[in-house]
């Protein structure tokens, strides 16, 4: 059979940014979006190493017990404020992405320029709390906007691998935040009455300012180099030729009839749903739609109960129960390096093993890591060196298990499991649930850690077992699926309900 004149060879495809190679044209678009993912990770982790320095400079705890108890509460609010803001942001993200995926990223970058400046000049608890709430709002926008942009801007066979880059850049942001925090020196006790040095007074403010520079870079890239919207959004808004043009870049070939047809089908299904008024509220009244929405929300919420954000945002406080101040920051750095490096394998195995298998493996790893120190602590002295060493080792195994599975896979899965007519709103709802659960987990972590770290590990172990069983029995594989489709709802089922709603 003779080759079509529109088809090109693999070598030609590679020259044009071919889809058969990981480093291609669409990767550049994805990386421009992943700068927002970096800001996400940085904002979640930045307080981990500098929280006590802020407590000392603002004089929240000067030795008085009541005053210091109040300081602990203020610290808890600062830790949780990002997650509280993210709840609001993720709820608003559905509205934002409807105006364009690239547009939403530009809004996010401009927003973080303002927030970074505001946080860096704060001098009071209320202003820093407000600034952190705003940071959380921006993070909430990122949780939906970036995965959606990646999902719509990549080759069908690379959605998994490129989707992992979102989580990779989150872990990179976490790592950079901890590394910059090392410049502050040894982590002080929050009850210290010693004044901070001049460098320390300036540096923690510069750390809050740093995302401003990343945001400016993101704006430059999206304004001057990667100016196109996603092909799905372009097609949806009647710009078919522009959609075809960007698809040619993504697939590295002039023959984009198949992906264009997939987008056309998804857009038509979505338009039919809009015309027939199938909103999120309407979908919740239909059993098949309600089922997939609830599954997505439960899967998203359970991710937080594995305990990852306690390890990321409060590891210094956790390690303080086991180690001297000299080792705390060093160990936190090692943990974030491990978190960053172990995200790389997920890029290559997410398409080979599939989403469900990776999720199951990750939950099994977290369960074993969290259960072992808890079980031993119940048999011997909880304060023994063995329990302490096992607890520290468990945090590393938990981080590794999460980094190769639940961390990156969830955000890929949420944009593959929902049918196109509810994808935007359902993904936003699932993201909102994720952040609500993060607040529930992170806010009391300071108090629980001071009481007994083994209680935390017991909770994480139990929730990971529950997550494993939930995924095993209820979650379906989405690997290789077409954009806008869902393994939970057949096309016939969708058309039937859309037809009914029109009656």
From Swiss-Prot:
<dbReference type="Pfam" id="PF00083">
    <property type="entry name" value="Sugar_tr"/>
</dbReference>
<feature type="binding site">
    <location>
        <position position="339"/>
    </location>
    <ligand>
        <name>beta-D-glucose</name>
    </ligand>
</feature>
<dbReference type="InterPro" id="IPR045263">
    <property type="entry name" value="GLUT"/>
</dbReference>
<feature type="topological domain" description="Cytoplasmic">
    <location>
        <begin position="154"/>
        <end position="163"/>
    </location>
</feature>
<feature type="topological domain" description="Cytoplasmic">
    <location>
        <begin position="351"/>
        <end position="356"/>
    </location>
</feature>
<comment type="subunit">
    <text>Homodimer.</text>
</comment>
<feature type="topological domain" description="Extracellular">
    <location>
        <begin position="48"/>
        <end position="76"/>
    </location>
</feature>
<feature type="binding site">
    <location>
        <position position="303"/>
    </location>
    <ligand>
        <name>beta-D-glucose</name>
    </ligand>
</feature>
<keyword id="KW-0812">Transmembrane</keyword>
<keyword id="KW-1133">Transmembrane helix</keyword>
<feature type="topological domain" description="Cytoplasmic">
    <location>
        <begin position="413"/>
        <end position="428"/>
    </location>
</feature>
<dbReference type="GO" id="GO:0005886">
    <property type="term" value="C:plasma membrane"/>
</dbReference>
<feature type="topological domain" description="Cytoplasmic">
    <location>
        <begin position="98"/>
        <end position="102"/>
    </location>
</feature>
<feature type="transmembrane region" description="Helical">
    <location>
        <begin position="164"/>
        <end position="184"/>
    </location>
</feature>
<feature type="binding site">
    <location>
        <position position="411"/>
    </location>
    <ligand>
        <name>alpha-D-glucose</name>
    </ligand>
</feature>
<feature type="transmembrane region" description="Helical">
    <location>
        <begin position="77"/>
        <end position="97"/>
    </location>
</feature>
<feature type="transmembrane region" description="Helical">
    <location>
        <begin position="103"/>
        <end position="123"/>
    </location>
</feature>
<feature type="transmembrane region" description="Helical">
    <location>
        <begin position="357"/>
        <end position="377"/>
    </location>
</feature>
<protein>
    <recommendedName>
        <fullName>Hexose transporter 1</fullName>
    </recommendedName>
</protein>
<feature type="transmembrane region" description="Helical">
    <location>
        <begin position="133"/>
        <end position="153"/>
    </location>
</feature>
<feature type="binding site">
    <location>
        <position position="167"/>
    </location>
    <ligand>
        <name>alpha-D-glucose</name>
    </ligand>
</feature>
<feature type="topological domain" description="Cytoplasmic">
    <location>
        <begin position="476"/>
        <end position="503"/>
    </location>
</feature>
<dbReference type="InterPro" id="IPR005829">
    <property type="entry name" value="Sugar_transporter_CS"/>
</dbReference>
<feature type="binding site">
    <location>
        <position position="304"/>
    </location>
    <ligand>
        <name>alpha-D-glucose</name>
    </ligand>
</feature>
<feature type="transmembrane region" description="Helical">
    <location>
        <begin position="206"/>
        <end position="226"/>
    </location>
</feature>
<feature type="binding site">
    <location>
        <position position="167"/>
    </location>
    <ligand>
        <name>beta-D-glucose</name>
    </ligand>
</feature>
<feature type="topological domain" description="Extracellular">
    <location>
        <begin position="378"/>
        <end position="391"/>
    </location>
</feature>
<keyword id="KW-0813">Transport</keyword>
<feature type="transmembrane region" description="Helical">
    <location>
        <begin position="292"/>
        <end position="312"/>
    </location>
</feature>
<dbReference type="InterPro" id="IPR003663">
    <property type="entry name" value="Sugar/inositol_transpt"/>
</dbReference>
<keyword id="KW-1015">Disulfide bond</keyword>
<feature type="transmembrane region" description="Helical">
    <location>
        <begin position="455"/>
        <end position="475"/>
    </location>
</feature>
<comment type="function">
    <text>Sodium-independent facilitative hexose transporter. Can transport D-glucose and D-fructose. Can transport D-mannose, D-galactose, D-xylose and D-glucosamine.</text>
</comment>
<feature type="topological domain" description="Extracellular">
    <location>
        <begin position="124"/>
        <end position="132"/>
    </location>
</feature>
<dbReference type="GO" id="GO:0015149">
    <property type="term" value="F:hexose transmembrane transporter activity"/>
</dbReference>
<dbReference type="InterPro" id="IPR036259">
    <property type="entry name" value="MFS_trans_sf"/>
</dbReference>
<feature type="binding site">
    <location>
        <position position="303"/>
    </location>
    <ligand>
        <name>alpha-D-glucose</name>
    </ligand>
</feature>
<keyword id="KW-1003">Cell membrane</keyword>
<feature type="binding site">
    <location>
        <position position="309"/>
    </location>
    <ligand>
        <name>beta-D-glucose</name>
    </ligand>
</feature>
<keyword id="KW-0472">Membrane</keyword>
<feature type="topological domain" description="Cytoplasmic">
    <location>
        <begin position="1"/>
        <end position="26"/>
    </location>
</feature>
<feature type="transmembrane region" description="Helical">
    <location>
        <begin position="27"/>
        <end position="47"/>
    </location>
</feature>
């Amino acid at each position: 059979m003779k080759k079509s004149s529109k088809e090109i060879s693999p070598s030609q495809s590679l020259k044009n940014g071919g889809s058969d190679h990981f480093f291609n044209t669409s990767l550049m678009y994805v990386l421009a979006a992943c700068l927002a993912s970096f800001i996400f990770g940085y904002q979640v982790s930045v307080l981990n190493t500098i929280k006590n320095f802020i407590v000392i400079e603002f004089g929240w705890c000067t030795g008085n017990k009541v005053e210091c108890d109040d300081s602990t509460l203020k610290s808890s609010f600062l830790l949780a404020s990002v997650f509280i803001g993210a709840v609001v942001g993720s709820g608003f993200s559905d509205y934002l992405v409807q105006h364009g995926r690239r547009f939403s990223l530009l809004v996010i970058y401009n927003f973080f320029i303002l927030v970074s400046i505001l946080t860096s000049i704060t001098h009071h608890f209320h202003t820093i709390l407000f600034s952190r709430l705003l940071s959380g709002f921006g993070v909430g926008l990122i949780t939906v906007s970036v995965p959606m942009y990646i999902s719509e801007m990549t080759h069908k066979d690379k959605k998994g691998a490129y989707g992992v880059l979102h989580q990779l850049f989150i872990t990179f942001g976490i790592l950079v935040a901890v590394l910059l925090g090392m410049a502050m020196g040894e982590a002080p006790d929050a009850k210290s009455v010693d004044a901070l040095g001049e460098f320390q007074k300036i540096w923690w403010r510069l750390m809050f300012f740093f995302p401003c520079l990343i945001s400016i870079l993101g704006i430059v890239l999206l304004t001057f180099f990667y100016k196109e919207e996603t092909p799905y959004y372009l097609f949806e808004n009647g710009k078919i030729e522009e959609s075809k043009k960007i698809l040619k870049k993504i697939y590295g070939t002039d023959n984009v009839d198949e992906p264009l047809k997939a987008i056309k089908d998804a857009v038509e299904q979505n338009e039919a749903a809009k015309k027939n008024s199938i909103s999120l509220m309407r979908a919740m009244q239909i059993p098949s739609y309600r089922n997939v929405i609830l599954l997505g929300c439960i899967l998203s919420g359970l991710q937080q109960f594995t305990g990852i954000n306690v390890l990321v945002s409060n590891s210094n406080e956790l390690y303080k129960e086991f180690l001297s101040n000299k080792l705390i920051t060093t160990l936190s750095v090692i943990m974030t390096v491990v978190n960053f490096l172990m995200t790389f394998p997920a890029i290559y195995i997410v398409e080979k093993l599939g989403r469900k298998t990776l999720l199951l493996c990750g939950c099994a790893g977290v369960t074993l890591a969290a259960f072992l120190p808890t079980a031993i602590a119940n048999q011997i002295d909880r304060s023994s060196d063995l329990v302490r060493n096992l607890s520290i080792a468990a945090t590393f195994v938990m981080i590794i298990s999460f980094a190769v599975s639940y961390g990156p896979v969830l955000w890929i899965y949420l944009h593959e499991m929902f049918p196109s007519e509810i994808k935007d709103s359902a993904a936003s709802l699932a993201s909102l649930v994720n952040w609500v659960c993060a607040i529930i987990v992170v806010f009391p972590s300071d108090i629980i850690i001071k009481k007994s770290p083994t209680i935390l590990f017991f909770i994480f172990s139990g929730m990971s077992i529950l997550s494993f069983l939930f995924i095993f029995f209820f979650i379906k594989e989405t690997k290789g699926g077409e954009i806008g489709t869902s393994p939970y709802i057949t096309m016939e089922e969708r058309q039937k309900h859309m037809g009914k709603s029109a009656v």
